[in-house]
Amino acid sequence: ISDGKRVEKVRLFIDKLGTTDQERVQNSVQRLEYNLTDALHKFTVKKQKKIAILRSNGTLEDVYLYDFLKTAREYYFIAPFTLDSVATNAEKTLKDLEKFDLLLVAKPTSPFSDEQKQVIDQYIMNGGRVLWLIDQVNVSLEDMYKTGGVTMAMPLDLNLTDMFFQYGFRLNYTLINDLYFSEIVVATGDGSQSRYMNIPWVYNPMVLSSNNHLINSNLDAVRLQFANGIDTLKNGVKKTVLLSSSPFSKADGTPREINLRIDPKAMNKELYKKGNIPLAVLLEGEFKSMYKDRVRPLELKENATLSRPTKMIVVSDGDIIKNDFDSQHKMPLELGFDRWTSKYYDNKAFLQNAMNYLLDDTEFLTLRNKKVQLAFLDKEKVAESVRAWQIKVFLYPLLALVIVMLLSGYFYRRKNIKKV
C-alpha cells in the first residue's frame, strides 16, 4: 500500500509452523483485516506515547534490538534512558523517567544499585509500566561454541530479587529443560570438511500459547533461549501466565555444566513430569513499594508506598527480543527468524502485543485477535460425492441406452405384429 510518499508492505499469507494448508488459509484470512488496517494506520498515526529503552546495567545493544525497535517506532516515540545519573541527581532522573509511559528492560547483565531500584520503584508507584526481559542465569550458545561445546551455567544476581518479590513474583536460578524444543545448528569437522547439522536443544523451549489473553491469542510458537522458571506469589495483584513450558519439561538447577552433546537417556519422558512452568507473566493492579517498611537509600520529594493502578510483564528470557545479526552482510535480521533453520517464530508478535497492552492500545489487539471462521469443504464428504457422481455418470448413459434398446425392440415387434 502506498500514499505516494511511502510504501507499506502488507503480509497476505501467514505460514505458521506445523500447520496444514487449510489452517494456513484460515490464519491468513483471519489476519487480513488487521494487516490492511495496520498498514493504513501507519500513514495516519499521530505518536503520543513514549517508551524508554534502558541503556544502563549491561542491557542488550541496539544492534540486537534493531528489528523490534524499528517496528515500535512506527507507533510510539522511542528514546534511550540510563540510570547512571541516579548517583549524581536521582530526583532529576526520576522526573525524566516519569515522562515515559513504558520502561523496557532488555537483558541486563550487571546488578542494579539500591538507588536505581528506588527510582524504578517510584516510577512504578506513579503509574509507570515496565516490560521486564530478564535472565537469571549467565550462559549462552556463543560461549559454548568458543569453548568446545561445554560451559558452566552460573546464577546471575541482578539485585532485583527483593523488588520482584514485593511485586508478586520470583525469578528462579534455573534453566528450563523442555522436550518440546527448537533446534540449533553445530559445525562438525575442520576446514573444507566442515558440515552443519541440526541437533535437538532442550534449553531452547518452543513455547505454544495457551490463548488465554489478548496478548497471546492466535500466536505461532515463541522461541526462548535458556529461559528460567517464574513463581507467582500471593499479594493481591492480578497475575496471568502468558507463556509456560510444555507438560514435558523440568527446571534444572544451577550452577551446572551445559554440554552440546546431550545424552539421549537423559531425555526420558519419565524425568519430565513437572512441566507447565510459567515463563512470562502479566501483573496488574496496585503494587506495594518495596520500600514501604524499609530504610530508603534516597530521600526523594515523593515516596509513595502504594502505586496507582498499573501493570507490568516479566519474561524469564532476555533473548526473546534479540534479533540475529548477519555478520557477512553486516545487517540485523528479522526478530523471530532463525537463519540456520530458516524458521520463523512469533517473538515479535508476542512482544508487540505485550507493548500494546501495557500502553492500553487494546483496539488493535482486539482486531489482531479477531477470529474468522471459514466454511471449508469436508474432504470426506467431497470424496464420497465425487464417487457417487462418477457412478452416476457411468450408469445413467448405460441405463438410458438399455431403455432405448428395449423401447426400440418393443416398437419393432409391435410394428411387425400389426403387419401380420
Regions found by a protein language model. Name each.
Residues I1-V420:
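Short, surface-exposed patches at the edges or C-terminal ends of soluble domains, predominantly
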